[in-house]
Amino acid sequence: MTARRPLPYFLAKGAFATSRAGEHGISRSRMRAADLETPFRGVRSAGLDLGDLVQRCRAAEVFMDDEEAYSHSTALGLWGAPLPAQFGAARAALHIGTPGATRRRRVGVIGHRLAQGTPMRLSPDGLRTVAPSTAWCQFASQRDDLSDDEMLVALVAVADCLITGRRTTGMRDDPACTPDEMRAAVIAHGSGRGARMLATALSLMRVGVDSPKETELRLLLHRAEVAEPTIGHVVPTRLGPLTPDLAYPAKRVLIEYEGDAHRENRRRWRGDFERVRAFQQAGWTVIRVNADDLADEVRCNALIAQLRLLLA
């Protein structure tokens, strides 16, 4: 059996245009080998995880022009924004914006025309995107099958993340943009698709929110006309200063949202137990909320009733 010819070292983990394969000494038969994938027409890749957004975008750069940029939900994903599941699905079509009158047409790509002067940025991974605030406004037009309430929660959750920064391994990344940049982007968006919902989401975004579920919880309280909780309130405890997810300092009531990671990690579960006990010993009433509470109407109503009683 003839040994498979190795790829050039610089393509061992990357992508290339089939039209330029000959320049790299890659034959047509080599391009049909099992170790190469076809992420897009006219492109071959090796060693890339095409289910990963960043690596799929790197493969697409092979055919993109210098002035093009990732836009809409693709850009938001590259900035680490928490998107509804259907927008972050592996192998989902990439949104690519092109300045001027034309737009990119290719299987696996949704092309868009960008206005001249659309602000651009480099993502944390060095990929060219429209500015995160602009991508957020574009995302408002991507309704898919989301209801009005679901889309509003998604927009606010993304906005909270962009102006706060993601928390990873205990540290918080720098915010992708400022509240003022978000406001300016909405003004620039004008009366485009989703303008009314963007204005509402703009009024509801808050700095300091750590997760989309915390956003969902906060908006649940907003819809129920419960007083708005404080974000980022520091409580002195025997463990030192602790910051609950949401707090009502005047009533010494706080809310902690606990996702599955809190339950599945034994060390974290024990830490949560001590954290709650420290809050209680400091004289605070602690309400612990999980995903089931937000998904079930009866439990939602019970949570709201409990809060109203405590805040009365």
Question: Which role fits each region the language model picked out?
Answer:
Residues R20, G25, R166-A312:
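Surface segments flanking catalytic/ligand-binding clefts of nucleic-acid enzymes
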